[in-house]
Structures are given as C-alpha cells and as structure tokens.
Amino acid sequence: VRRPPTPRQAGFPPVRQPQVGRRTQNRAQGLDFKQEIMLGYSDTNKDGGTVASRWNIYKAEKELAQVATQHGFQSFFFHGTGGTISRGGGKYHRFVESKPGKTVNNMLKITVQGESIAQLFGNPMTASYNLTALTSGIAKHEIQSKLFGEQVTFPEGVMANLSQRAFQHYRALIEEPGFIDFYSKATCIDVLEKSKIGSRPARRTGTRTLDDLRAIPWVFSWNLSRITITGWYGLGTALKSLKEEQPQDFESLKSVIESWPFLKFLLIQTETNLIQSNQTIMRAYADLEDDADNRNKFMNLIRHDFENCVAMIELLLDNPAKTRRTGRYDNMRVRNKKLELLHQIHLNSLKKWRNTPDEEVDKKEKELTKLLSIINAISSGIKNTG
C-alpha cells in the first residue's frame, strides 16, 4: 500500500501540519488553502481580565495572519464572541474596525447567542441595521488594509506593557484570599448554577473553584449585581501606574487614540461597562457578604480601580463621559428607575431563597422559579448579559 506523502513532500509547512493524508490534501486544494481559525473571548476574559484578553487576541490575529501569508494560504477568523462587552460584544462595525490590518480578508464569522439574537435580529429594522453595519465594516477594513497595509505603526510595546500591568492587577484580585466567598455571596451565581438556561452547565466538573466555573455565568453573575468588573477591572490601576512611572508612554497612547481603532474601541467599550455600573446597587449586593472585613476589603479594591479607570479614561479622551456620551447616560437614567425596583425585589427574593432550608423542597423550588423570572427581567433591562 502506497503511503501518503509527508507534509514536506506535499508542500505543507513543516511542524504546523504534522500529518497530512491524501484526503486532507484534496480538501485543502478544494478550499483554495483557506484556513478558518476560531478565537475565544470568554475564558480569556475570565482568566486575565478584559485588557489582557483583547490585547492577546489582537496579537494572535496579527501573528496567525502573518503565518498564513508566509506559507501561501489565506486565513479567516471565527470570533467566538458573546453579547456582553466582556465577552467580545459591541457594535459590529466598530468591532471589525478594531481588528489588525490584513486579518479580515473579506471573510468573517461571528457567534450570536442567547437574548442577543432577538436584540440584534428580532425584527427587520434592527436585523437590517446590524447586518449592514457588519458588511460595511468588513468592506471598510478590507479597503483600508489594501490602501495602507503596514504603513501605519502604533505603540504596541506600550500596549503590551499596559496589558501586563492590567493582567497582574486583575489576577491579584481574583487570587486574593476570600475572593470566592465574596463572589459567592455578592452575586447570584448560586442561582445561575441551579438554572436550566444555556447549552452547558455553569461548572465543568462541579467543584467550587474559579477555574471550574464557565465564563458565561461568570460575566452574567457580576453584571446582574451591577459590579461590572469583568469589563474594566485592572485597566484603571494599570493606566495610573503607567502615567506615574512612564508618562511618555501614557502620552504616546493618548496621541494615537483617534488613529488606532483597537485602542479607541477598547477604551469606549470599557467606559460603557463603567457607565453600566451602579454604586448604590453594587453596595446593596455586596452587603449580602456577612463578613464585614472581607466585604470591605474587596469593595475597596473594586471602588479604587473603578475611580482610577474613570479618571484615566477621562484624561485620555480629554472630556468626562457625561459630556461626551449624553445619549448613553440618558438611556441608563430612564432604565435605572425600573431596574432599581427589580434589583430590590431580586435581593429580597435571593435572601429568602438562601435562608430557606434545603429540606423544604417545594418552597425552595417556588422561590427559585421566581428568582429566575426576576433575573430574566433584569437581564432585559440591562441589555449587557448575553
């Protein structure tokens, strides 16, 4: 029996294609050497925070596209995003615009999940708007890549430094002793673990660790408490330390905000999550943690980074968000009137459910059903939980 040729004999790059059979060769030729590459946004956010997640995905896209070009095939990316900003969500045209040059190649796949499907494509008007934004964004990216190529350079070394600072600060938070206890009390993650929503269970094996928790309920639970740390934590302290220790690097980032879509998109998205936080509601959920020392420790860390983030983004963008984004604030102001009432009902129901003994099965199940209905209502009001 004749053996199939080795990867080198078949013309495939060594190592990157460890074993290639004849059928695979024929299939690759039929696809004109186009390679689909999937990128994950959710677990990278949970593991390293939003800044490190976005920056490392950006680098991966750029480097993988270069590898494809070097070896004579075309890459296109499948973005495994979610509805929340923390998991890669956002305006489609801005999302595409923020990608590195020569990485879209007129082709892009993207996931749409949960309630985001109805929000984005639930009626002809919104569906038309979002599909037009996506296709026009791809067209614009392709045109700009061909016109400018690699002519424009950005301070990527500074961005890598900022990303590392944000990553370290984020990891310090989630590795701080007592964090799991605070998280378990200050969010309704225990309710989400009992729910039947989603295609997979909230935890991979059932152990009570952060590593075992899936990224979707991680983001969902924080956002329901309006403690939106998954969308900004780490950036505030990272920017402040960069400004104090390397002011010239801080200024170099500021100078390219309007010309570097990736950086501007990151800052605007982060700012949106800051706007969607609510200090009063945040404190009410934090009060569910009955250990005052533990509660105060984590709320002080969270508030400190929140304040740094607001101040640093204001410096970078020259004006406070309230003067630049009046529409967003007006929108949240209208929704908050109803949301504050829903959050209070949710808090009362959550306390009642937690205090009900497990032996009272019917009573506990009835309260759980009520809780899930309230969560659905809050989710619809926040519009940042998918």
What are these regions (language model features)?
Residues 1-3, 75-93:
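Conserved phosphate/anionic-ligand binding catalytic regions in large, soluble enzymes, centered on
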Residues 1-8, 41-47:
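Conserved radical SAM core fold
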Residues 2-29:
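Carboxylate/His-rich catalytic cores and anion/metal-binding grooves
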Residues 7-14, 47-52, 86-93, 120-122:
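Short acidic, glycine/serine/threonine-rich loops at helix termini
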Residues 26, 40-43, 51-60, 73, ...:
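Acidic, glycine-enriched catalytic cores built around paired aspartates
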Residues 63-75:
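A structural motif corresponding to the C-terminal end of an alpha-helix
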